[in-house]
Every structure is written in structure tokens, then in C-alpha cells.
Amino acid sequence: MAPTEIKTLSFLDSSKSNYNLNPLKFQGGFAFKRKDSGCTAAKRVHCSAQSQSPPPAWPGRAFPEPGRMTWEGPKPISVIGSTGSIGTQTLDIVAENPDKFRIVALAAGSNVTLLADQVKAFKPKLVSVKDESLISELKEALAGFEDMPEIIPGEQGMIEVARHPDAVTVVTGIVGCAGLKPTVAAIEAGKDIALANKETLIAGGPFVLPLAKKHNVKILPADSEHSAIFQCIQGLPEGALRRIILTASGGAFRDLPVEKLKEVKVADALKHPNWNMGKKITVDSATLFNKGLEVIEAHYLFGAEYDDIEIVIHPQSIIHSMVETQDSSVLAQLGWPDMRLPILYTLSWPERIYCSEITWPRLDLCKVDLTFKKPDNVKYPSMDLAYAAGRAGGTMTGVLSAANEKAVEMFIDEKIGYLDIFKVVELTCDKHRSEMAVSPSLEEIVHYDQWARDYAATVLKSAGLSPALV
């Protein structure tokens, strides 16, 4: 491909003062037009490679099935990514509720010191570390510990943790496509999934969802937005869901004029107004790519059409998302911005567990404001890209996610500018059109995830913030 400038994203050209966004168009006719109603300018895409959507995890409503409780005592749980943010918060919940939950297996990366502390505290039967070289270090850290677990390294170790015979629910807290194979193994073993790994659905939805249906596995969302939707659809009658409304904080630049975006630095993007999160997700909040990816997740989880999934800016992050029913009623889930609540609900569902207000502050609505505004498609072109990729389906959604992950990595490393993130993602998706797999296998999903990262890495900044391929 020759060096390319995306002229349709006009605000990327610093020489222009008019910031109207023309309809985006990928080369070769990958275009969409807008409708004017709703909180976002929803898009209709015309693309020859449009796949039939896989069966949703929760088709617009949620009911517990009688007889699913097959264990005695505390629910047995495996955790993939135990030393990460989701994993440590999960273990905090287990420690606070030993009569409700117990840990049977843990998979971690290379933080052996923390993993050893977790093993001593929760006494799992099986643990996994990133590679074989860490086994001796872990054994040394556990010297003298009586309840020494079995230790299996690498990807196979994660898979064994995921399908441990005693586990009922598997928490998938690992980032990226590395979490896809263990999730598939857990589903094939009949384990319910507490899903905190976005790639499982965004990249793997066309493969994972039919598999979950085949094995009668429940996929329970552990992120705040989809947990909110899941909570709102409890008990809804069939066909009652009309619209999904995803709330977004707006990120670090929600109040910054569009013309100032070309000047922002990495440190600016990492100043989230509400949440304390990792670097990648904080940048995703600034670009609103996190919300675009959540639109795709909502489609796969709940079966809503893309025209019926909307985004609204809610600066306070108190309402985590909403659903509208056919009679125009709007149901919302509210709470402090605290990831522990959605994680807890994936473990306790369909039950509600009492939480002490000492460690779980209660919401006082008299002390908070609730405001909303329409998101700006010029400031956040990620929304258009996500809707287009979602409608294309197949491997395009995984390519979008992987390209964004690589672009954010390059931005954090100061190899590209903030506005180049959007260009890198669009160029990568455009290149993928010619070889997109409509109904991909697991191997194709993993292959194109890596392809997208490699291709995105070839897009470099050149004069005038216009990317060029090398």
C-alpha cells in the first residue's frame, strides 16, 4: 500500500480549522452513513463480508436455571490472571467471603512473589506460572509450606487451571488473546465464565458463543458496563429489550477542545477523572475505544442490533449502563465506580451477597450529580470505527481490538502521537478487508490477532500527522 492520508478524519490535519467529520470510508467502499436520532450518530455499514451473528450469551433477558448448583459448601473458583488487577480484586472478594467462595486453582504471569503469597493465603490445588524458569523460584518462595500445589508452566498450565475438575466458575482476568485458549478450555469442560477478558468476545465471539451454547455454559460479564446491562435484564420477558445505552466517562479529554488534541501528551491521556486503572485502559477511555469495543461486546452478549446500542457521556460514572424496554421504560444500574461489585456479581449470581458498608461504601444520591451529554464523533472517531468493524463481523472485530492495542502501546512509548492512534487502527482494518474470515476458526482468530499487531507496528508517524507504511 502506498503512503496514505486519511482525509476523511479532517481534524487530524492540523492545517484545518473546520472540524466537521465527513462519513468515514475505508478504501474499497467500506463506508457507512448516519441516522440523526439517539445519543450517538448510529451507523449503517454496507459490506459484502457480513457474517450472521452467533447466538448471544443472554438474548435480551436473563434467568437462572434451576438445578445448576452442583457443589457443596463455598463455590469453587479458578482464576486466570491472579496477580493482575481483576485477579487481585477477585481474591479480595474471596477472602472477605470464605463461606461463599474458595479458590481451587490460580494462573499468574511472572509475579512469583505475589503468587506465593496468594498460594499461602488460599491454598489452591494447582497453580500456573508464565514459563518453566519460574518454577524453582516459586518453590523456593513456598519452602516449608505444607499445602504445596501442583505447578504447571506456560499456556498448558493456564489451560489446566481453566479446566480444573473442581472449579465451577473460571475468572478470566488475563489481558489479550492469551486468554482465549484457556477460556475455550474452560467452556469445553463445562465451567461458567466470569468474563473480564475482552478479546474472548471481541475477537473470539464467532467461535466462543456457539461453543458456550453447545456446552450450556454461562458467560457472566465482569466489567461494570455489561454487568449493569446484565443486572437490568434479570427477569425481563422475551422480546422486552428495545435499546442498550452504554455510559462513558468521556476520559481525560472530555472537556478539551478538539483542536487541542494534536498537542496532548501521554501523561495527559493517563489522567482519568474517575477511575484508577492501568495505562492501556486509561488511554482507551481517552480515545473512547473502550466504549467502541464495549458496543461489540454488548452485541455479542445480549444480541442487540448495532442500531440499538448507543453511547452517552456520563461524567460521574455512577450510572454504569441502562436498558430501554419496549414500553419506553429505562432501567439503570447505579453504584460507585468500583470494579469489585461487577466481579462479585459474576461469582454470586443469581444471589446477592451482603457487603459491609465499611469496605463497600453505600451510594448517597443526595451527594452526587447525574449529568449526560451526547458524545462528539469528531473528538471520538473510535466510535465510527468500532460500529463499522462490528457490522463487518468475522475477524474484523479482533483486528480492530489488536490494532488499537498496538497503537496504544506505540503511543505510550511515544513512537506515535495521540491522533495517530485512530489512523493506525483504520489503516489496519482497511488492509484486513481483503482477507477477512467471516466464520473464523480459533486458529484464524489467533492468527489475525497477531497479524493486526504486526501490521499496525508498520504504521509510523510522518509529516503533518499523516501515517505512512514502510
Curated annotation (Swiss-Prot):
It holds the Pfam family DXP_redisom_C. It is found in: Plastid, Chloroplast. GO terms for cellular component: chloroplast. GO terms for molecular function: 1-deoxy-D-xylulose-5-phosphate reductoisomerase activity; manganese ion binding; NADPH binding. It catalyses: 2-C-methyl-D-erythritol 4-phosphate + NADP(+) = 1-deoxy-D-xylulose 5-phosphate + NADPH + H(+). 1-deoxy-D-xylulose 5-phosphate binds at residues 198, 224-225, 249, 272, 285, 290-291, 294. NADPH binds at residues 83-86, 109, 111, 197, 199, 278. Keywords: Chloroplast, Isoprene biosynthesis, Manganese, Metal-binding, NADP, Oxidoreductase, Plastid, Transit peptide. GO terms for biological process: isopentenyl diphosphate biosynthetic process, methylerythritol 4-phosphate pathway involved in terpenoid biosynthetic process. SUPFAM superfamilies: 1-deoxy-D-xylulose-5-phosphate reductoisomerase, C-terminal domain, Glyceraldehyde-3-phosphate dehydrogenase-like, C-terminal domain, NAD(P)-binding Rossmann-fold domains. Its main location: plastid. InterPro entries: DXP_reductoisomerase (IPR003821), DXP_reductoisomerase_C (IPR013644), DXP_reductoisomerase_N (IPR013512), DXPR_C (IPR026877), DXPR_C_sf (IPR036169), NAD(P)-bd_dom_sf (IPR036291). Its cofactor is Mn(2+); Mg(2+). The keyword Manganese applies. Pathway: Isoprenoid biosynthesis; isopentenyl diphosphate biosynthesis via DXP pathway; isopentenyl diphosphate from 1-deoxy-D-xylulose 5-phosphate: step 1/6. Mn(2+) binds at residues 223, 225, 294. Its EC number is 1.1.1.267. The keyword DNA damage does not apply. Belongs to the DXR family. HAMAP family: DXP_reductoisom (MF_00183). Catalyzes the NADPH-dependent rearrangement and reduction of 1-deoxy-D-xylulose-5-phosphate (DXP) to 2-C-methyl-D-erythritol 4-phosphate (MEP). This is 1-deoxy-D-xylulose 5-phosphate reductoisomerase, chloroplastic. The gene is DXR.
